[in-house]
Amino acid sequence: VVEVCVRVTGGEVGDASSLAPKIGPLGLSPKKIGEDIAKETLKDWKGLRITVKLTVQNRQAKISVIPSAAALVIKALKEPARDRKKEKNIKHTGSVTMSDIIEIARVMRPRSCAKDLANGCKEILGTAVSVGCKVDGKDPRDVISAIDDGAIEIPDA
């Protein structure tokens, strides 16, 4: 069993040349895998940069999507998918709810370095700052300090 991780843009057939050195030696067709990845990521992750893990066993590839925190935050904004080729460096101006942030922190929990869910939420809020969106209409930095002050309670489950 071999695992290969690849960064792709959801719903797009990446050029086979970037996949070839990684999966060519395993006896798989890079072009076919590229199309499979595009099909797998089209409906949920269109236009978002995500990591895809290929688990290769007996020349069969299983595709699993590993979304980054940023991809999850952008997905929670529920913005319409934009054409990546036309618009570069998109600023996300929408607002995410605090319950969305807690939900994302739960999803990211196994890969997070945080001790508890509250700190996991602060990690995601930091990502929200980088994405450029607001949380319940407020700046994510203010929400982080509100969590530190105890003004916002985060359930430990």
UniProtKB/Swiss-Prot annotation:
From the record, what ranges are coiled-coil? none
Give any Pfam family that matches: Ribosomal_L11
Stored InterPro entries:
Ribosomal_uL11 (IPR000911), Ribosomal_uL11_C (IPR020783), Ribosomal_uL11_C_sf (IPR036769), Ribosomal_uL11_CS (IPR020785), Ribosomal_uL11_N (IPR020784), Ribosomal_uL11_N_sf (IPR036796)
The UniProt record lists the keyword Ribonucleoprotein: yes
Q: Which Gene3D superfamilies match?
A: Ribosomal protein L11, C-terminal domain, Ribosomal protein L11/L12, N-terminal domain
Enumerate the GO terms in the molecular function aspect: structural constituent of ribosome
What keywords is this UniProt entry annotated with? Ribonucleoprotein, Ribosomal protein
- Any Gene Ontology biological process: translation
An annotated GO cellular component of this protein is: ribosome
Q: Does the keyword Ribosomal protein apply?
A: yes
Q: What family is it from?
A: Belongs to the universal ribosomal protein uL11 family.
What does it do? This protein binds directly to 26S ribosomal RNA.
Q: Do you know which HAMAP family this protein is assigned to?
A: Ribosomal_uL11 (MF_00736)
What is the recorded name of this protein? Large ribosomal subunit protein uL11
